[in-house]
């Protein structure tokens, strides 16, 4: 009898811990979403964060009932499919994070700074971090060209490339080393259009550096190789915590899209 009671208490404590974990996760995700909303960072990743917050709250509140409800028939297969999806998502997250490092050697021929958002003609904090990393790189290897790549913004208030070029010149980078690519609307186009400019201007690009955020390195390197930049090195920049969560969630979708639709 004592053994049965003891097992029951252990079971109840486990349920309480599970509920508490998902309640806390729900609150943290909700706070993350509110902060990004206040900042004006409205993206697909933000909507996913709010959706996950709601799902975590529902699971914390009703996980026993939901588990029992999905214990047989089609709902059981649906539960297994959801678990499989979560596992695949976590594997992709691990893959992305495992590649989020810098591997430059400061002997490359050119730098490509990938666009990351502009508002009212000013670079976003994320893009500023990339440009600052590029400036630091230039001070260590000034015998290069810097391509800033990014087309019209969501609000049609100029191109990312123009804002990036202005930021670089305002911070001491000579105008004659800056190459502007202002037509692209995706990472794949960043590379394709920049490579065409390099070839038209006969700029050496045997070895290049691409500058982007840590969460974006894996996909950016795959696209670079796909577009013919065989010797592409990553210059990784940090992402602040509130931006990182939705960005990583969204990046998984980007990687899946890349493998399924883009790299053919």
Task: Tell where the protein language model's regions lie, with residue ranges.
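Membrane-embedded alpha-helical segments of integral membrane proteins
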Residues: 15-65
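Juxtamembrane loop-transmembrane helix junctions in multi-pass integral membrane proteins
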Residues: 10-13, 40, 69-76
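A transmembrane-helix-recognition feature enriched in membrane-embedded lipid enzymes
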Residues: 244-264
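A structural signal for short, hydrophobic/glycine-enriched beta-strand patches
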Residues: 84, 91-250
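Hydrophobic alpha-helical transmembrane segments of multipass integral membrane proteins
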Residues: 23-34, 54, 80-93, 252
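Structural signature of transmembrane alpha-helix termini at the membrane-water interface
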Residues: 31-38, 58-62, 91-98, 135, ...
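Transmembrane alpha-helices and immediately adjacent membrane-cytoplasm interface residues
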Residues: 56-102
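Short, Lys/Arg-rich, polar N-terminal cytosolic tail immediately upstream
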Residues: 1-10
